């Protein structure tokens, strides 16, 4: 089971990840920025937006990070600065291990679902705190909605894949 500690062995601890996009805080409370560990195997279900800058470190595996108007390839060792309020979405090519450095104390985030035309189909603001509950609620709300863009495109249901946000949130309480 993942836990907060003073030292971190990323590769050993990643084996204990609950599922994709855990964003499990692995540092001691009060560490700023706080490292959040994820082992991802599927495309991120939404674009993630934070009101504070973040840094993403690609520890293992390959993939891409998608911004609104660009994509970048991610290779082991890559470090990506994500400016505040910049929507980004991760697309692993197989299994990846990533550390995301987030502000501590936590700040507001949002999740957004975009259409290929560029319009926002839906978005949800996420209060600071245990964000995994809000991630899960946002996907359920999106799936329960009409999922129709202003351009007329109807978006498919979002698959949760191997995410385990309910278990991560329970572990953080």
Segments from the language model and where they lie:
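Cys/His-enriched microdomains
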Residues: 56, 110-115, 146-149
């Amino acid at each position: 089971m993942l836990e907060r500690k003073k030292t971190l062995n990323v590769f050993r601890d990643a084996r204990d990840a609950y599922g994709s996009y855990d964003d499990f805080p692995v540092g001691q409370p009060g560490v700023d920025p706080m490292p959040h560990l994820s082992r991802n195997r599927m495309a991120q279900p939404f674009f993630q937006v934070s009101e504070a800058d973040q840094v993403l470190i690609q520890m293992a595996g390959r993939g891409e990070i998608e911004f609104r108007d660009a994509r970048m390839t991610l290779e082991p060792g890559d470090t990506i600065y994500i400016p505040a309020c910049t929507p980004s979405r991760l697309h692993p090519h197989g299994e990846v291990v990533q550390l995301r450095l987030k502000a501590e104390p936590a700040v507001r985030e949002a999740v957004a679902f975009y259409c290929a035309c560029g319009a926002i189909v839906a978005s949800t603001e996420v209060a600071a705190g245990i964000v995994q509950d809000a991630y899960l609620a946002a996907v359920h709300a999106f799936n329960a909605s009409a999922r129709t863009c202003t351009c007329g495109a109807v978006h498919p249901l979002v698959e949760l894949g191997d995410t385990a946000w309910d278990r991560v949130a329970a572990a953080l309480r």
